[in-house]
């Protein structure tokens, strides 16, 4: 009997990527092979995104391609919450499940492609760290599912439910397994990382025989003992985040915070129903930088939210200039089906949204470029992601750069035979542009 093969298409954010990794790991554990193309697959699983309209369309297109090329398709992920929409366009998909519905996906696979008999996972070994879709030297670590907030532009709680935190012992054991597998950088992700453990009332758990609370600070402190890069994403600026800045100042975890501020106008933040909107974020940023001068802050913002006036937008620009954030992403407001913000009055015309986006990016590009210019002459440690095919250049990142969303450090004039992805290098920064740094190699620190 031939080994059954399952194709897999993964769309969406890093949290969805982790869901895909978990399903793929279970498939491999049960003896399925993962097909490299549509033709060789007995069926195809498409893990979708449903957050904004462009992502919905991309997901529907991916389902259509899988149906056209293979014809036997199971749909999962955030868009799976809207089965009617999927079946209107693709009525013949085999099954539709929601986000993080691992067991439902596996049951659907079993129904249409039974698992191979006599499979022994202890002989057909799956790596301890599971199947990963990222390069070997970094990995995403998802610590919770869902969110307790009800931001008016977001439908994540309706797709993924309220906050459910993983036991801290499970989180730390996965992190340790990743380190043993050679991972040099862990990126901590969730919908609301700094709320970790709230739902469990910070329940006590155990790791390596030691008691650890299921709590944001305690988890970060334990991760900091692993001796690898630990990067925090999706952190809301709650008061208890201040203590984690101390860990950064001590070199326990990377001095990098990804905080989705989204706006600065109190009126717009209230319309958005953002948590911590009443916090004086500028004072908080100043305090953090006093504690940890190397701190890098990345954030995302929405311009053109319903009801945003020119005065609101100017408040945002003024805040941006004063905050001097290192890395920033910006989006024009896009209606999301099911979001309560759709019902707000005074929607902003598209041409004004675009004009505000361009003004916003112009201000931030000047800030980012000036900050990168100050790096010239500094010595930094970087992690190599890849090597250029045609040039003697390593594409790397410093502590200030998360993969895919931030900039790179291009290490020039190297001997490519001595360097590979996953190596840590010590470099001197020689030049900069608006987003990236350029450097020369001082020495290879670790391989």
Curated annotation (Swiss-Prot):
The keyword Ribonucleoprotein does not apply. [4Fe-4S] cluster 1 binds at residues 13, 49, 78. Its EC number is 2.8.4.4. One of its GO terms (biological process) is tRNA modification. It catalyses: L-aspartate(89)-[ribosomal protein uS12]-hydrogen + (sulfur carrier)-SH + AH2 + 2 S-adenosyl-L-methionine = 3-methylsulfanyl-L-aspartate(89)-[ribosomal protein uS12]-hydrogen + (sulfur carrier)-H + 5'-deoxyadenosine + L-methionine + A + S-adenosyl-L-homocysteine + 2 H(+). Transmembrane segments: none annotated. Disulfide bonds: none annotated. One of its GO terms (cellular component) is cytosol. Gene3D superfamilies: Methylthiotransferase, N-terminal domain, Nucleic acid-binding proteins, tm_1862 like domain. GO terms for molecular function: 4 iron, 4 sulfur cluster binding; aspartic acid methylthiotransferase activity; metal ion binding; protein methylthiotransferase activity. It comes from the Bacteria. Residues 373-443 form the TRAM domain. Residues 4-114 form the MTTase N-terminal domain. It is found in: Cytoplasm. Binds 2 [4Fe-4S] clusters. One cluster is coordinated with 3 cysteines and an exchangeable S-adenosyl-L-methionine. Keywords: 4Fe-4S, Cytoplasm, Iron, Iron-sulfur, Metal-binding, S-adenosyl-L-methionine, Transferase. InterPro entries: Elp3/MiaA/NifB-like_rSAM, Methylthiotransferase, Methylthiotransferase_CS, Methylthiotransferase_N, Methylthiotransferase_N_sf, NA-bd_OB-fold, Ribosomal_uS12_MeSTrfase_RimO, rSAM. Belongs to the methylthiotransferase family. RimO subfamily. Catalyzes the methylthiolation of an aspartic acid residue of ribosomal protein uS12. This is Ribosomal protein uS12 methylthiotransferase RimO. It comes from Acinetobacter baumannii (strain ATCC 17978 / DSM 105126 / CIP 53.77 / LMG 1025 / NCDC KC755 / 5377).
